[in-house]
Amino acid sequence: MNGSPTPKRYSSKSSRLYDDYYNIPYQYSNPTPMNRDYNDVGSRINADKLVPEEYKRNTEFINKAVQQNKELNFKLREKQNEIFELKKIAETLRSKLEKYVDITKKLENQNLNLQIKISDLEKKLSDANSTFKEMRFPKVKDPMVDDDPVSENYDQINVPKHRAPDATGNPRTTNKVSNTSDQDSRLKAIERTLSVLTNYVMRSEDGNNDRMSPLPSPLNTISPINNRLNFQEPKRYNPTVKVNPSDDDIMMYESAELKRVEEEIEELKRKILVRKKHDLRKLSLNNQLQELQSMMDGDDNIKLDNVSKHNHATHRHSSQSSRDYSPSSDACLECSNDLYEKNRVKPENNMSETFATPTPNNR
């Protein structure tokens, strides 16, 4: 230890390079080392020579095994995560598959029911057609053969009695008339049932075709404005005809209908505005025409009054001056001509008089 009170004052800057010399342990002593791996100076002795090679191999093998174990654990975690994700996907797919299986079963049942109904309706239709043909074209009976049983006694002849004209007709003819009326009523009833059945079959076939066909877009369901002028509108898609329409179909159909109605309203508004403009224009033109007609009628009346009341002898216009040679617009044609003839020839002025300087009166 330096005993100087100010050791740095007398030390140079270059001495700082050797300050570490005083920090060397055991500089002034030589203690016995506590560990065999270190020498007297304190440096580590090469201990690899002392460790046998078997221990070295064992440590290397253990280190490799630990590293492999870590890598395998990492791969195992990744595989477990993948398996978890695949299980989730499999559950969702299973639920969707069950849903679609239920839907297909329902559709198959509906199809079977519809086929059964169609077969029953076809049977009824065929039966109705056969009965209709039988009623319309009955079997023609032999007119010579009588319905009543012929009596075996040929000697007896049934002679009709003479009846009064007021008596009732032949009951056989009345029965025939009643039978024909009954047949006509039955034929009408059968025709009604046939029409109902055919309409029902056609509707069911249209429903099946709509179910098999893809859903049209709402833009295709909207008829353009130019086509609406035609009286025969095209057949629009109506999902309500279906047996079980979905909510999306109904919403699409309603939105398309709303859009079509809005377009029709806008078209009607435009037509109404154009009609109002035409009406206003017509009123204004009629008013102008009436005003012009009234003005023309008033001018004609004024001219007639002036012609009837005009006196050429006593007439004098404001335009009858010495400087006005043109006929006045207010004067009549004769007066204006007379005025022009009077003022046409003027006396010539003397040049000396024109260029002479005027003399004042009070000179």
From Swiss-Prot:
Chain intervals with Polar residues compositional bias: 170-182, 349-363
Indicate where this protein is primarily found.
Answer: nucleus
* Ranges in a coiled coil: 62-136, 248-297
Q: Which InterPro entries match?
A: Spc42 (IPR021611)
Q: Which UniProt keywords apply?
A: Coiled coil, Cytoplasm, Cytoskeleton, Nucleus, Phosphoprotein
Protein's UniProt name: Spindle pole body component SPC42
Q: Origin, by domain of life?
A: Eukaryota
The subcellular location is:
Nucleus; Cytoplasm, Cytoskeleton, Microtubule organizing center, Spindle pole body
GO CC annotation: cytoplasm; nucleus; spindle pole body
Q: What does the UniProt function comment say about this protein?
A: Forms a polymeric layer at the periphery of the spindle pole body (SPB) central plaque which has an essential function during SPB duplication and may facilitate attachment of the SPB to the nuclear membrane.
Give the gene name: SPC42
What family does the Swiss-Prot or TrEMBL record give for this protein? Answer: Belongs to the SPC42 family.
List compositional bias (Low complexity) regions by residue number: 319-329
- According to its UniProt entry, this protein's organism is Saccharomyces cerevisiae (strain FostersO)
Its subunit composition reads: Component of the SPC110 complex containing at least CMD1, SPC29, SPC42 and SCP110.
Where is the PTM Phosphoserine found along the chain? Answer: S213, S217, S284, S329
Annotated region (Disordered), positions in chain: 160-184, 310-363
